[in-house]
């Protein structure tokens, strides 16, 4: 019998972690992963359903797999809208929602029974990872308690469920032992970690720690590898972790989605509504940790956004001088409360505001990177091509931030650290020469 499984993972890093866990279980039970539809006995597709374009990509992928294989199991965020999937592809074998690991594995069992004698010893202790060996995503919770009007994640993934502290730290240790040099801490709401447990006290390596954001960061910092924080909601207690960055326990990098600067728009989004307070906090963080890199994301064209309110966002951007910024044009997501707001912004205006926003940020980024010329940066080697080395600095998360390009020399390996002298820059990337390897 064919025990081969095809797997397609769509969407964000949180979905990628879900895929890794499903694949780890399947591999532990003796299934073989194959890269083509035609070789697979069944195909699993982990979908995204956050915005319309993601829904369409997921549906297109399901249709393609059905056409080329015909035996398809669907899971992930779009699985919460089973009727949408069934209307497009009525013959899929099974549909489940996000983080339904056991349900997916059971569905595979039903339609493609496992081998009688799985070679479980072939599974590494850290599980199967879909990222390069030197970095890994570490998911610390599921779900979200926020009620942002533009988002339906709580509907698809449920309320906050923090993973046990010992489970997270054990996984982190195994990843380090497997050679991982960088942990990217992710969840729907990273800084809310532990709220649902009422900060339960647990024992870890002979000491008592609280199930809360600060304690988790402190314990991860003791691993001695890069720890990068993503999706950090701007709660007041986020201020407490900045000294950990200053002291080198975790990377001086904070991914903190702010979404807008105008107070009326923020209230309509049900987000923290004080750009003045945010600017004061940013100044405080930089005073405590001058090397901190601040990344954020914003939405332009939110329903009712006026030209004056958009101009306020641009003014905030210029004053905040954030290091890394992403921007999204508002997209009405089925089920989001923001869809009911008056005065939707036209697509032409959204597009125009998006380009104006990105022009402002490109200039900010260009000037910030120009100031790094002549400095020495610790970099992590991501890739070595025929003629160059591609790396990232402490300021750069994989996939979403800039890169450091270096001339190729011998003795450097992917996943190693090195010191690089920066000689040039552009809008988003740095260029330099290797000074020496840190191994």
UniProtKB/Swiss-Prot annotation:
SUPFAM superfamilies: Radical SAM enzymes (SSF102114). It is found in: Cytoplasm. Pfam families: Radical_SAM, TRAM_2, UPF0004. Residues 3-113 form the MTTase N-terminal domain. Its EC number is 2.8.4.4. Belongs to the methylthiotransferase family. RimO subfamily. This is Ribosomal protein uS12 methylthiotransferase RimO. It comes from Legionella pneumophila (strain Corby).
């Amino acid at each position: 019998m064919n025990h081969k499984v095809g797997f397609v993972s769509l969407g964000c890093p949180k979905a990628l972690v879900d895929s890794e866990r499903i694949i780890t279980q399947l591999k532990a039970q003796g299934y073989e992963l194959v890269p083509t539809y035609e070789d697979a006995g069944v195909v699993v597709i982990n979908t995204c359903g956050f915005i319309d374009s993601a829904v369409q990509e997921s549906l297109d992928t399901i249709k393609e797999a059905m056409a080329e294989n015909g035996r398809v199991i669907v899971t992930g965020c779009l699985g919460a809208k089973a009727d949408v999937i069934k209307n497009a592809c009525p013959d899929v074998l099974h549909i489940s929602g996000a983080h339904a690991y056991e349900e997916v594995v059971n569905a595979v069992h039903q339609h493609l029974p496992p081998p009688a004698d799985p070679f479980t010893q072939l599974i590494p202790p850290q599980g199967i990872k879909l990222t390069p060996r030197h970095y890994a995503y570490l998911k610390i919770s599921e779900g979200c308690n926020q009620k942002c009007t533009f988002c339906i994640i709580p509907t698809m993934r449920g309320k906050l469920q923090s993973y046990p502290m010992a489970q997270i730290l054990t996984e982190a240790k195994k990843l380090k032992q497997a050679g991982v040099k960088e942990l990217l801490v992710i969840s729907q709401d990273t800084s809310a970690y532990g709220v649902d447990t009422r900060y339960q006290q647990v024992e870890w390596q002979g000491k008592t720690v609280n199930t809360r954001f600060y304690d988790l960061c402190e314990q991860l910092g003791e691993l001695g590898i890069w720890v990068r924080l993503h999706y950090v909601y701007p709660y007041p207690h986020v201020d407490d972790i900045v000294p950990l960055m200053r002291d080198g326990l975790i990377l001086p990098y904070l991914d903190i989605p702010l979404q807008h600067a105008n107070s009326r728009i923020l209230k309509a989004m049900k987000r923290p509504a004080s750009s003045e307070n945010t600017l004061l906090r940013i100044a405080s963080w930089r005073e405590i940790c001058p090397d901190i890199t601040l990344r954020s994301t914003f939405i332009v064209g939110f329903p009712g956004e006026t030209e004056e309110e958009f101009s306020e966002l641009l003014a905030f951007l210029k004053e905040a001088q954030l290091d890394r910024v992403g921007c999204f044009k508002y997209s009405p997501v089925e089920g989001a409360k923001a869809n009911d707001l008056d005065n939707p912004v036209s697509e032409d205006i959204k597009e125009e505001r998006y380009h104006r926003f990105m022009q402002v940020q490109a200039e900010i980024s260009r000037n910030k990177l120009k100031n790094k010329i002549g400095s020495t940066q610790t970099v992590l080697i991501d890739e070595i091509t025929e003629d160059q080395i591609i790396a990232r600095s402490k300021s750069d998360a994989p996939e979403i931030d800039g890169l450091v390009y270096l001339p190729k020399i011998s003795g450097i390996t992917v996943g190693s650290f090195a010191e690089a002298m920066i000689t040039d820059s552009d809008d988003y990337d740095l260029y330099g020469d290797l000074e020496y390897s840190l191994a």
